[in-house]
From Swiss-Prot:
Family designation: Belongs to the terpene synthase family.
Protein name (Swiss-Prot/TrEMBL): Silphinene synthase peniA
Recorded superkingdom: Eukaryota
Transmembrane segments: none
């Protein structure tokens, strides 16, 4: 009768134990079901953001104010607001803002994410005419004002969002220079244009050329209003000609595009499940790339923009000591919006749930098999 040797002896010639082979099998299976995110924490995004010292206090105040105004009453609704932690997002790109200015920015952050939801998943996502009307009302608030009794038949939460924005705008108007007010107004109009544009072209957006597509996407990402807020809380007094300089426009565009690309990498799983189309990774996979190839290609787009950033900074104009100090604060603020957004995306459970810290460490995420 044949004698069966102990299992460990079977692998003696290869000097591998059962546990070692099991580890190899497990490792192979892992490689087949996971892929690696790009290393997004590079260049200026490698530094950890500072936190506004008023973060905890103002978060509690702002969340309570918005929850009451927007009638968030269920445990699920309140938990969503608290866990999203939009105040932390703000705290990481406004570390030097005073309490009053930081409160205004936190209120805007709470407002903007719920306002954006109307266009992404809410009652405006399939109705371009109603989406445009909502954008027009926002412009009305910043130009001729909005009375409490206007549009009484609209949805209560839509009206609540308008009044929240009106409150923010009134606080900005009381403190900011005419130039900051104008740039904020223009930034918000561009933001709304991007939101409405996404509603209108969901089915037929031309994604063949990525650079024009990213130019389209940067409108709706909301980065430029954040940059204008830096002028607001730093009380910058830069001349209008500064904002017309090509390098300044390039820096602002790049800050927005880097943020878009970061978000698209991190939100891919969530947006794929939702059936979203406005995501670079989704677009690249539709072109035949694997998930890893799409991540790698997106990483190249990010690195290209980081290199362009440094070139643009080197072309900034000089104005003398006093104004050049303000220029440096402005440039740093543009960086901090992208840095803060990236770190916040991993600090909360927005994209990866309770696996956020592990994925931040390993960069390994689940491989998605495309649906037929």
């Amino acid at each position: 009768m044949e004698v069966i040797q102990p299992t460990t002896q079977i692998f003696a010639d290869n000097e591998k134990t059962v546990s070692q082979v099991a580890e190899e099998i497990s490792s192979n299976e892992l490689r087949e079901t996971t892929v690696y995110l790009p290393d997004l924490f590079v260049s200026f995004c490698s530094r950890a953001p500072k936190t506004n010292p008023y973060y905890a206090e103002v978060k509690a105040e702002s969340d309570a104010w918005f929850a009451k105004l927007y009638s968030l009453s269920t445990e699920k609704e309140l938990s969503r607001l608290t866990k999203a932690d939009f105040a932390l997002f703000a705290a990481w790109w406004t570390a030097d803002a005073g309490k009053s200015e930081f409160r205004t920015i936190c209120d805007w952050c709470n407002w903007v994410f719920y306002f954006d939801d109307q266009f992404d998943e809410g009652h405006l996502c399939e109705d371009e005419a109603k989406a445009q009307r909502e954008a027009d009302i926002l412009t009305q608030i910043m130009t001729v004002g909005l009375r409490d009794d206007e549009y009484p038949d609209d949805l209560p939460r839509a009206r609540a969002l308008r009044y929240a924005f009106r409150s923010v705008w009134e606080r900005i108007s009381q403190r900011a220079s005419a130039g900051v007010q104008r740039r904020f107004r223009e930034a918000m109009q561009e933001f709304c244009k991007g939101l409405v544009g996404q509603v209108g072209v969901r089915a037929d957006i031309d994604t063949r050329e990525l650079d024009p597509y990213l130019a389209f996407r940067r409108q709706s990402i909301g980065v430029v209003p954040c940059i204008v807020f830096a002028e607001y809380y730093h009380d910058l007094r830069l001349p209008d000609e500064f904002f017309e300089h090509p390098s300044v426009k390039t820096i602002m565009d790049l800050a927005a595009e880097i943020t878009v690309l970061h978000n698209d990498v991190l939100s891919y799983h969530k947006e794929y499940e939702m059936g979203a189309i406005h995501n670079i990774v989704i677009i690249l996979r539709e072109r035949g790339m694997t998930q890893q190839e799409a991540y790698n290609e997106t990483d190249k787009l990010i690195q290209k923009r980081l290199r362009e950033w440094h070139l643009a900074v080197n072309q900034l104009p000089f104005y003398g000591e006093a104004l050049d100090l303000q220029v440096q604060k402005f440039v740093q603020a543009c960086q901090e919006v992208a840095v803060g957004n990236l770190h916040w995306s991993f600090a909360t459970e927005r994209y990866f749930g309770n696996q956020n810290n592990l994925i931040r460490k390993t960069r390994q995420v689940e491989l998605i098999d495309l649906k037929a």
